[in-house]
């Protein structure tokens, strides 16, 4: 975490911050994303990320800014506009690039820093704007089922922010009732 800029960034082999910080640069130290996206990839410790950022209020401010920042970009080491960049610009949600998987969980981080209504607001905005039964009702691509899994979990009202951990962040369900049929005849009802 680069405190001077408030984002994740990379260091060189000697431990010095890499020159020319640009939060909108895709590629370089990041795969299919920029510092705007990968800063939130502390799935296992959102509270620790909040501490790095100076507490809940600065983290909320940074998350808020992701949705309203200009959707400008620097194609960086890719040398051209990859489809993930084009999708972020077309979706027009600031630096939030929902069509690209590395940042999809970030909406749920509001749950961890005391503002779950912002999780609910952004979830509904994304689900209503980017998913439908029409020919353009599915944004981005499908890396190993992540985008559809994000939608299914979010539509049910919860999401595994940290894969492999037995906990879920609460969202805003689209359904009044969902029943998951589990092994041995058990049901989980939301």
Language model region names:
Residues 3-174, 178-189:
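Active-site core of glycosidic bond-cleaving carbohydrate-active enzymes
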């Amino acid at each position: 975490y680069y405190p001077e800029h408030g984002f994740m960034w990379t260091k060189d082999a000697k431990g010095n911050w890499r020159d020319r910080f640009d939060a909108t640069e895709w590629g370089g130290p990041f795969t299919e994303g920029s510092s705007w996206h990968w800063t939130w990839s502390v799935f296992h410790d959102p509270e620790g990320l909040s501490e790095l950022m100076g507490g809940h209020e600065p983290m909320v401010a940074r998350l808020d800014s992701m949705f309203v920042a200009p959707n400008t970009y620097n194609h960086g080491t890719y040398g051209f506009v990859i489809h993930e960049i084009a999708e972020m610009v077309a979706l027009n949600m600031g630096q939030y690039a929902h069509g690209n998987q590395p940042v999809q969980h970030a909406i749920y981080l509001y749950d961890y820093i005391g503002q779950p209504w912002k999780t609910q607001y952004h979830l509904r905005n994304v689900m209503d704007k980017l998913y439908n039964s029409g020919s353009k009702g599915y944004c981005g691509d499908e890396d190993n089922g992540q985008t559809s899994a994000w939608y299914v979990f979010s539509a049910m009202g919860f999401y595994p922010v940290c894969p492999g951990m037995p906990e879920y962040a609460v969202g805003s369900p689209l359904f009044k009732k969902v029943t998951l049929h589990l092994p041995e005849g058990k049901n989980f009802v939301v």
